[in-house]
Amino acid sequence: MFKNGIPPTINWSSGGGGGGEVTYAVSASGDDGVFSSFNQPSSFPSGFNSLGATATDAKTLREVDEDFGLFTYTKAFFRFQNINISQGATIQSAYLKVVYSTGTGTAALKIVGTDADNVAAPSQVSDGATSLHTSAVVSWSNPSTHSTNYQTSPDIKTVVQEIVDRGSWASGNAIMIQTYYDSGGSTKQLRQARTYDYSSAAYPAKLVITT
């Protein structure tokens, strides 16, 4: 049985001897949300002091309080269950698809994964520590916004490959993707994504992987 009764969408590729394309969607309320850190210097924090996982949006944010010169950082997370990929399989491509309902700023948004064999849904702020990030990082330049249209990231196969190459990775495990801003000067940088809890899961984040 699939967790939450929601199977992935499978679109098998034809020809070329490859595996296939599979689209996974966030399928539970606690599987997307944000880690936030307040009153920080301009450098991106290594830890966070707030976790939110039940809102209808997940913000990726870097904002400065001009009166005090301190920053708020919020990074979004999206956890995808039941990834049907064997340990060490070659990832041909991988894309994060999200609906960004609103945003501001033009700095590049960063995409990483949680470097874990079978990441659990976040339950404490330490689950957002940057020490858990993959070494692979992909930049997404100035993502567009729209109330209902999905935006597709650049290829993040290096992020997914690093996770499935782990020695204890197994088919059926979960992958969590995170997005954050670590630059942008004093200009507010924001992308606000729809979450599983928005409008009865009408626009959950998706992870499209081809093997």
For the regions a protein language model found, what residue spans apply to each?
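Short, intrinsically disordered N-terminal pre-domain segments
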Residues: 1-14
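A short beta-strand element within beta-rich, extracytoplasmic domains
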Residues: 80, 90-102, 207
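Aromatic sugar-binding interfaces of carbohydrate-active proteins
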Residues: 173-185, 191
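Extended extracellular/luminal ectodomain segments enriched in beta-structured repeat modules
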Residues: 72-75, 85-95
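Flexible, small-residue-rich N-terminal segments that precede or flank a structured functional core
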Residues: 6, 16-82, 112-121, 128-134, ...
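Extracytoplasmic/secreted proteins, especially bacterial periplasmic and envelope-associated proteins
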Residues: 75, 79, 93, 155-159
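Beta-strand-rich interaction/scaffold domains
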Residues: 100-173
